[in-house]
């Protein structure tokens, strides 16, 4: 049984060269990975669960955007395995109460030119992906996603180690 504890919050910090040289361990999970983990009938559930099992030592993270999107998507009537909103929120809350989880505050702005080159955004569909990758990079986290078309050139601080495509 997972250990229960108060939610851990990742504290944003200034990049340090020594810290940046090492591969970040904790991973901010994209909403598509969260959904695959929570929905045992999801086509990518086994792949997401295997990846998390192999990487749980570093821990995992979520943020308000990924949590809200997970609840919204999994509870909408068009979702194949839709559940009531309260049930999805309960399952996600249980997952985030484990010792391996940390909450990442969304304290990085897409408008901050220090973090993002918005001239590289090719369209509206890249905005959230670029933001989440930038949030991960700003907090020295990996960003785990199923999305192979990640707009990494938008994020100024990113390196290949920050992006994990499952």
Q: Residue locations for each model-derived region?
A:
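Acidic, PIN/NYN-like endoribonuclease modules and their adjacent C-terminal/linker elements
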Residues: 1-22, 108-122, 130-166
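A generic structural signal for short hydrophobic patches within well-formed alpha-helices
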Residues: 34, 67-70, 150-151
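Acidic catalytic patch
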Residues: 40, 64-68, 90-121
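Conserved beta-strand segments of alpha/beta enzyme cores
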Residues: 59, 100-102, 161-162
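Short, amphipathic alpha-helical segments that act as regulatory/interfacial helices
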Residues: 71-75, 137
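Short, well-structured N-terminal submotif of metal-dependent ribonuclease cores
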Residues: 1-62, 74-90, 157-158
